[in-house]
């Protein structure tokens, strides 16, 4: 690519595309968020018009790990952590904690295709490692995947928020705290999708070599059945998405580079984590399922870091199905995510 990444021969670069996430408006235009602006494009992402989101922008700085959804009724909901209120990250090794760390999460919505935004609300003050997913269920509930840091010792936990009112108000789920010791420990950065039987399925990043899963039978209000999956994974987030074909699409960083089983481990010292783990972020792989995750196609690497890459990570992917079977993949444009913007086609992976 123009940024120095290797991409599979059936994958095409989309030069200059914003990082996303993207939603499609009722008239076919694209909408995303960048900085504190809502950006709208009528030419499939080549040029953009910007609208401010906040009446008082000095109080807000939207973190790059933002999430967006446009509901079937036309509401656009944005979930984000506010960097302007980020405070007190002071990891103390003797405590294995940062007791006063704060990075609040907010929701805000637009009812006029992004021109104006309303109903801004803070959902928690706790340190939010990342907000990673935002979906609408078949019953019209909006479910957002977030995080809340726990203390004594410091570790991360996952929570979701559910809105039955198109983003006007929210109910928090049980907090999923599976333990851990360290500033990158615990369960984190979950992705969520609805299964054919109506339940929600969550895949959580862990330091334990695989994604862990949970299920909810009540639109994300209560999560249960926490257990490891058989999907090997680095300590990095995946993204699960239901395609218009009905297949599930998963993109993630595998625990080991393709063809290797000797990737060096990190952590295990109780500072970053209590267990040594893979931080492999040099490749993004995809696979698809026709039976709600019971079986999957063989994983395929779609992009890889090279010596010439502008960034040495490819992680924190975003997925947008621009047209049926045409999937745009972007990474979170930052050092930890990399700078990938490509399109791939479902037909090439089934």
Task: Locate predicted features.
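Asp-box/BNR beta-propeller blade signature and adjacent active/binding-site loops
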Residues: 1-350
């Amino acid at each position: 690519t123009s940024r120095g990444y290797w991409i599979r021969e059936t994958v095409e670069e989309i030069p200059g595309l914003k990082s996303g996430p993207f939603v499609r408006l009722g008239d076919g235009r694209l909408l995303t968020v960048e900085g504190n602006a809502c950006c709208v494009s009528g030419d499939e992402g080549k040029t953009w018009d910007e609208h401010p989101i906040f009446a008082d922008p000095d109080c807000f700085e939207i973190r790059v790990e933002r999430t967006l959804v446009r509901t079937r009724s036309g509401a656009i909901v944005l979930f984000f952590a506010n960097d302007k209120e980020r405070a007190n990250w002071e990891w103390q090794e003797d405590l294995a904690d940062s007791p006063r760390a704060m990075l609040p999460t907010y929701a805000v919505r637009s009812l006029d295709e992004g021109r104006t935004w309303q109903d801004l609300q803070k959902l928690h003050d706790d340190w939010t490692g990342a907000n990673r997913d935002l979906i609408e269920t078949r019953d019209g509930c909006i479910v957002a995947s977030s995080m809340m840091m726990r203390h004594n010792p410091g570790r991360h936990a996952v929570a979701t928020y559910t809105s039955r009112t198109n983003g006007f108000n929210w109910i928090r789920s049980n907090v999923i705290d599976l333990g851990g010791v360290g500033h990158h420990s615990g369960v984190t950065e979950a992705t969520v999708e609805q299964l054919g039987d109506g339940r929600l399925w969550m895949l959580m990043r862990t330091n334990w070599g695989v994604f862990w899963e949970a299920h909810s039978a009540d639109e994300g209000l209560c999560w249960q059945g926490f257990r490891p999956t058989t999907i090997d994974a680095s300590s990095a987030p995946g993204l699960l998405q239901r395609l218009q074909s009905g297949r599930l699409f998963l993109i993630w960083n595998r625990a080991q580079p393709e063809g290797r089983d000797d990737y060096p481990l990190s952590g295990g010292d109780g500072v970053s984590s209590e267990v040594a783990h893979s931080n492999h972020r040099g490749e993004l792989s995809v696979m698809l399922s026709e039976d709600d995750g019971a079986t999957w196609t063989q994983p395929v690497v779609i992009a890889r870091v090279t010596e010439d890459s502008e960034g040495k990570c490819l992680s924190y992917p975003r997925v947008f199905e621009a047209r049926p079977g045409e999937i745009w993949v972007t990474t979170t444009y930052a050092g930890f995510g990399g700078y990938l913007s490509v399109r791939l086609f479902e037909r090439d992976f089934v």
